[in-house]
């Protein structure tokens, strides 16, 4: 008996007005709704919306008719285990139960507080959302009750062991229901040794299987024992005056359809939400009904509950004498041990009879098995005799077969020896003839070797004289070829030196630009700190202004001081605006310098690619020299030189003389300043132009696809040039050579208005376009609207790009080309 049931049992009222018997209280009054709900939560029983079970009938007069209907509809067969408790119900119940806390040992004086805490542990999560005032009142009551214990004659209760045992039994019962134990129903005696002997000697025969009862026979015997015919006659007599409409509910069909629908959707969200809603509504109604007598918020009510609990304990102890030496079977039933023994004997007697019957059958089966084992032993001995006789006969047959086999082998060996002797004499005569022929061939071979040695001596003398003459002529030709090739390499070396100088100058400029950027950033930080100081002064002035405006109504004499403060505030605000303007201008300058630095980097990358191209060409010319030396040629192959350079060696020297002034202008440091204009690169095969567009700042670099990583493009171009140079070194196919004879000028670079995924370089594109005839096309770039580089700009301007036509060479003459003009305007609006 719990403390909650003892307290609330006296004040609970029945809705029907009549008292009902209950197993929870000795007085016969039912528990409160809150106590019943908490007991259900504690033992895992949760009301599911899919199951609407009614306890009894609405009208007591119809109880007999309902019992008759249930008796006729009751199935007499024993069905398999069915889990009536919904698994989702236990999950929902666990979701609202608070986690169990470990209770420390408490003194006997704090019985009331321990009972309250144990009931609070089993409460749902909805009970935790109560106000802090409730918790404070509970704490004060616990302290007061523990400090001033109640004095009574009866000893104090300690129901911790009772609660622990109840919880343990409830957990075991729930575990048995959710995970039922699988019982192995074995026929025969349950003794282990006897069972092992039966397993070793028992065999199912057709007679035993035919004598086993079937499922149908079990069902028939169960129906005979249930007296179904008698119950049916009583049910027919009871149904004469039965009207099903009076018993059944009007909304029964709708509720049955709703129940079926919910059973189908047990795992859906709607069922869970409805279950949560029902639980919350139930908790709300309980809170509303018991608000005036809440257990944990009313100290006086708790004291009264403790006194009532002690009185009930005294009554139960006084009434314990009536049930002494008796066993409680539940439902208020107490029986003596003798009665229980008589009932047990009546129940166990049929079981013992069945055991005797089965043991008799088992003994008969053992006798049958013993007879069969004797027959089996006799048959086995007969089989062994037959096998021994068979083995003796087999040994005699094997001895005779062995003697016959030896005779046959001796005859065969004699015939084979005669044949072998005849064969040896025949082969010896053939070997003698072959030896005579071998001696004749050896004499012929010696004579042939002498003749060949004389011829080799004459050939060696002739070859030495020819090699000496050929070596002298090759040395003279090699000296002449080296002189010619050094003359060809002079312009390449000049271009390489100029490009390296230009590269070093660009690196110096890059360092200066980075220093300027760092200085400007430092100044920006200083201005920002100054702006913050001015903001602080403005705040102080504003506070002072507010205080002075309040004092203006009281003191008219401070009007002039207030005016001076306002003027100083305006001056500080003007200084702040000035500093902000300086910061914005310096930030714009920093961004423009970053743009110049990016342009400078692109120009350095462009010069690096040009240097690599020229070095690769020098390597290829050296390789062509080595090829000419190996082939003993005076000059380099003009066809390959034309395929590589675009012109012959003579035309190339003439064009290099015209290119020298342009290379000097390129090496001028005044022309190498970072600007947004295009850079003109003089190639080795003519004037090849490449536009280097102004790069956007770092935070807008993703909007332009024309400037990607130069290292990847550089590696790719180097691989392409190496592959094409190897192709030039080993020569071309005849079809390719015919096409390359028409190509006298490399294809000019085309500038596409769309952003390219590769960096813009001024490399010679004849390696990739050997089989394509040159086409001179002029592409016009339309002005595109690009974002400005300032964070304070109010708009964007057009970047106008004008590109002239690429240079074309016709008939070995070179036409002058116009310079590329690319201007990037950065408009700053403050």
Swiss-Prot record:
One Pfam family, short name: Eisosome1
UniProt entry keywords in alphabetical sequence: Cell membrane, Membrane
Gene Ontology cellular-component terms listed: plasma membrane
Intracellular or extracellular location(s): Cytoplasmic granule; Cell membrane
Low complexity biased stretches: 128-148, 741-761
Transmembrane segments: none
Entry keyword rRNA-binding: no
Residue spans of biased composition, Basic and acidic residues class: 810-830
Residue numbers spanned by region Disordered: 1-29, 128-156, 650-830
GO biological process terms held by the UniProt record: eisosome assembly
Function: Required for normal formation of eisosomes, large cytoplasmic protein assemblies that localize to specialized domains on plasma membrane and mark the site of endocytosis.
The protein, known as: Eisosome protein 1
Annotated organism of origin: Kluyveromyces lactis (strain ATCC 8585 / CBS 2359 / DSM 70799 / NBRC 1267 / NRRL Y-1140 / WM37)
Lineage, uppermost ranks: Eukaryota, Fungi, Dikarya, Ascomycota, Saccharomycotina
